[in-house]
């Protein structure tokens, strides 16, 4: 396993002329679900086809959570379970918070995993984008935040309006691997809302109340955003 290498080779067609298939399992919070939606949009753009079962997939991707001990254990259990369920020759890829926070440990202790993809790795790209947030808390060069998403299959949808956090709470490690606050522009968010075609929008972020501060929008800048979104949905 090479945690910092790009995943382009993993995503090469295994059989020429046949569409490649993937299975994506998402763990953790609604923000992780948004990340998975954006990964699926990227997969679709690259010609990958989703399947309903890991034993039908050429690639099995686990979007992990590492917020608390129980979440980390669930991530490990899921990785092991999907590793057992995948068909012979299928690749097992681990991404998400656990891949970023504990990538080296996963690589060392879980031989079932073929690739660890921390934040900043373009999963479908051919070039690695190495990321090490650590004490410098650098933002990923490749960011899921503004990737397009497919239309929502449900009447409601989560929309992530910012990534990262500027607070330094002693009980929370999220800023060390999600990076500093990065707010999206109102135009970017409204475009995503329109494309989702959902009747109800739930806004999510690591720190919703801080939306816009890093962009110089001032305090309570989330209020005009909410009003504009409300004008667009039923």
Model-identified regions with their sequence ranges:
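Residue-level signal for the nucleotide or nucleotide-sugar donor/cofactor binding architecture
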Residues: 5, 184, 220
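Proteins enriched for Cys/Gly/acidic motifs involved in redox and nucleic-acid/cofactor modification
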Residues: 12-212
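Single conserved hydrophobic/aromatic residue that forms the stacking wall/gate
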Residues: 1-14
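Alpha-helix-loop-beta-strand connector modules within alpha/beta enzyme cores
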Residues: 218-234
